[in-house]
Design a protein with these regions (language model features):
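Short, flexible helix-loop junctions that flank or precede catalytic/ligand sites
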Residues: 1-365
């Protein structure tokens, strides 16, 4: 039942439905039509959790838990088990068996500059399933090949397994190796890493220690579940009380190096999905906007629009290029755009493949 292919991103086990897989963003049958019962999903959950007492306790007390699962000789999975209507439901994210190659992911050339950074914070953001972990793994792998550093990762759970190459790479997993991101990150400052990957900046304490690490000469890589660069800054600032936000903005402006946001969009030819990427880079202009806050005519999006020569790009510009190159169709591209009405105007010279949608205008307001 756990056989996978390169096109499958997730597996779903839910009472009342046959097993399902997600292929290129859409659910499809997993090869059997037998409907799962509550007892079926309970047994599957029990097998996946095994003797992980922390996961067992979380499922009982909090109604959900996260575990990693390895299928011998095949794939690894990041598993979330949760209660719904009194029964277990399971989502298994497929983790490829090999670390993704930077060039194979077709990441923007600008992101190669991260490999040479000596300090600061790099954030990769996007919704669940947008490829954040793959991008970070590819960056870590390139650092592992080209630098001679101590690299430390703190993950929940560990996804891609890195072997020592030119670097020494230590990977710590939440709950089995450390009780929290914040404690592991604090300990990391005494473990002499040059590069620290924090799986997610979930809380105020983790953000504060990440900033401290960046300010004391470490390169910190992490993720946030935000949709673009502007929302990322506001999310971080919003974690802190008003009395601390001015100081926080100042520290963040000085520490951030890149904010990379991703969306995976179905390709026009049906051959999977393509990563649409937004890049906000630390420049004099963007540091000012982060520190002082965005105002009319002085937004991070404005900075990205005029910052192409500095290596920046914004979602809608990236989507426009893919539409013009025939990688995306117009309807799909507009559905994933930040400002679909504006993008539709930019594409007005192309043959109309979709009718103008009045909802595109209202979605921007």
């Amino acid at each position: 039942m756990l056989k996978t292919s390169s096109k499958i991103s997730d597996l779903f086990f839910s009472p009342g439905k046959p097993p399902l897989v997600e292929v290129s963003g859409k659910l499809a049958p997993a090869g059997t039509t037998r409907v799962l019962s509550s007892e079926d999903t309970r047994r599957i959950a029990t097998d996946l959790v095994g003797q992980n007492q922390h996961a067992i306790d979380n499922l009982k007390q909090l109604g959900s838990c996260d575990v990693s699962y390895c299928l011998p000789g095949a794939h690894r999975f990041r598993v979330n088990i949760f209660m719904q209507r009194g029964s277990c439901a399971i989502v298994m994210r497929v983790i490829p068996g090999t670390v993704p190659d930077f060039d194979a992911l077709n990441l923007p050339v600008e992101l190669k500059k991260i490999i040479g950074l000596r300090n600061g914070i790099v954030l990769v953001t996007g919704p669940t399933g947008s490829g954040k972990s793959s991008t970070l793994a590819a960056i870590i792998d390139r650092i592992n090949k080209e630098q001679s550093y101590h690299v430390l990762t703190i993950e929940d759970p560990i996804e891609f397994l890195h072997v020592h190459k030119n670097c020494v790479v230590h990977q710590r997993e939440l709950h089995s190796d450390t009780p929290s991101f914040a404690l592991a990150l604090r300990a990391a400052l005494r473990q002499a890493p040059k590069v620290i990957l924090v799986g997610e900046m979930r809380d105020k304490e983790t953000i504060e220690i990440a900033l401290e690490a960046a300010e004391t000469g470490h390169l910190v890589l992490s993720t946030l579940h935000t949709i673009d660069a502007s929302k990322t800054v506001e999310r971080i600032v919003g974690v802190f009380p008003m009395s601390e936000q001015h100081t926080l903005r100042n520290r963040l402006a000085k520490s951030f190096r890149y904010i990379i946001s991703q969306r995976l969009v179905p390709r026009k030819d049906g051959a999977g999905r393509v990563a649409v990427i937004e890049i906000l880079k630390s420049t004099l202009r963007t540091r000012e906007y982060v520190e002082k806050g965005e105002t009319d005519g002085k937004t991070l999006l404005d900075a990205m629009r005029v910052g192409e020569q500095e290596g920046m790009q914004h979602f809608d510009g990236n989507i426009e290029r893919f539409i013009r190159e025939g990688v995306l169709d117009m309807e799909t591209g507009l559905a994933y755009a930040t400002n679909p009405g504006n993008l539709q105007l930019e594409l007005s010279d192309l043959p109309k493949s979709v009718e103008p949608d009045p909802l595109l205008e209202t979605s921007e307001k």
